Amino acid sequence: MGMTDEEAMLHDTLSELKRQLRSNDSAKIVLIGDVMMDCYIHGYANNLNSRAPVPVLRETSREEDVGAAAHVARGLRSMGLSSHLFGVVGDDTAGLSIIESLEAEGVTTHGIAIVEDRTTTVKTRMLASRESLIRDEQLLLRWDIEEDDPVPDEASVALYEQAIDDLQGASALIASDYGQGVITDQGAEKLFSAAKKGNVPVIADPKLTGLHRTENVDWILFQSQGLELMRRRIGASTGAEAAEKLIQQYNWNHLVVLSGEAGVTIYSADEETVHAPCGLIDLRQMIGLIDAAAVAIAFSLSRGLDVYSTALLANAACECILGAERTDAFVLSKDDLIHRVGEHVWNLQVSKR
């Protein structure tokens, strides 16, 4: 039984994506946003506290990793892209550890400002399982140490000036907003305008409270919950209608919606909607999902790929994260992405034998 025309196009597109991923061509990506530390504490939760109905975690291991925009920078580096990261950290242990970790992986850190007396955001997740059962870990608790005050004016102005100067020759600009004070109204307006003038496409992962900063942005990333919230807020009857209204209101080119087990959908101002279904059966976690999609889109833009190819690549990147069993797999890697795209190609070939 042969492939239909649609299946043949899918097969050829995926095969070309695999070829592109295997190439060693590099490209420059400018990245600005909040930088933080992620800490993971693993253990067993066999008992409840005798004085309160809360589980007791017996720690077995812990690990630290960079998060937010720094997490995106690691993904870009893994994909063979040159990431120029701009953000701030505090003059504390966590901040210095972030810089050291990034430098150890070859990520450029000259754009990270160390702000005196500022607290570096640290998000700690406690992951537990029952020792007597063979079961995946579950998130038990998360607690945050953070400072979301605006970055001091002097540091913020310098940060955006450096980022604007660095746009020359960039294939894309990524803005990663976690609400920690780096992405500002004035800074975003100047940076996005400079990118537009330089024909550098902008990818933005905005807070829903910061959509006003994203007018005229090329690529916007939402999770499905965010689109549903906006649907209710603007009174649209469907997610597709909400996406269309948001694209018109903010003059976006593309709205990328990540829907977990439902896959990835790209709504566009001037093109047909494209949907890539998720091929996973067992979804394990979602940490780093938007970061992975941003990396995949940046890679796609650096190769001049179309929206259809971009949707397939972003979906495969999300599948890598959704199926991750280890915390070190929460960062998108080129090897994992090549393997995932290859699985889609193989499945198409096998199903049509």
Feature-to-residue mapping (PLM):
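Glycine- and other small-residue-rich loops at beta-strand/loop junctions that grip anionic moieties
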Residues: 86-87, 177-180, 286
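Conserved beta-alpha-beta core of the PfkB/ribokinase-like small-molecule kinase fold
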Residues: 47-52, 56, 126-134, 138-145, ...
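Short, well-ordered alpha-helix to beta-strand connector turns
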Residues: 26-27, 80, 170, 217-218, ...
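Active-site metal-binding loops of divalent metal-dependent hydrolases
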Residues: 34-35, 178
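Conserved N-terminal subdomain of the carbohydrate kinase-like
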Residues: 5-7, 29, 37-174, 331-353
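Structural beta-sheet core signal
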Residues: 31, 85-87, 204, 257
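Conserved phosphate-binding/catalytic region of the ribokinase-like
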Residues: 4-20, 169, 186-201, 206-216, ...
